[in-house]
């Protein structure tokens, strides 16, 4: 009798709302590069009020690394606050910049 091995990875999903000097400083592009390097899925976008939002999915420990990066951002950014909200996974297959 053959034994089957199943590997289950819990997908953790969050929404982020980043406040501060986060537009016009390559925040979205840098966030996308960071997410891709961590093999996370989701999106990032600018908002009309000058903030940046993101939806990120992946293993909890890796998502937490991304959150830590978001609190710093790229060198030109000045992040004042990051709001974090748990949400349901949407099963994205890549990470993109929404316009």
Which residue stretches match the model-derived regions?
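Intrinsically disordered, low-complexity, mixed-charge
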Residues: 2-99
């Amino acid at each position: 009798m053959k034994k089957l091995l199943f590997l289950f990875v819990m997908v953790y999903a969050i929404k982020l709302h980043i406040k501060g000097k986060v537009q016009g400083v390559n925040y979205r592009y840098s966030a996308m590069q960071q997410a891709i390097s961590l093999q996370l899925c989701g999106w990032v976008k600018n908002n009309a009020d000058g903030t940046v939002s993101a939806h990120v999915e992946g293993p909890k420990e890796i998502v937490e690394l991304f959150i830590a990066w978001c609190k710093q951002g790229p060198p030109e950014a000045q992040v004042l606050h990051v709001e974090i909200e748990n949400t349901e996974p949407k099963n994205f297959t890549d990470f993109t910049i929404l316009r």
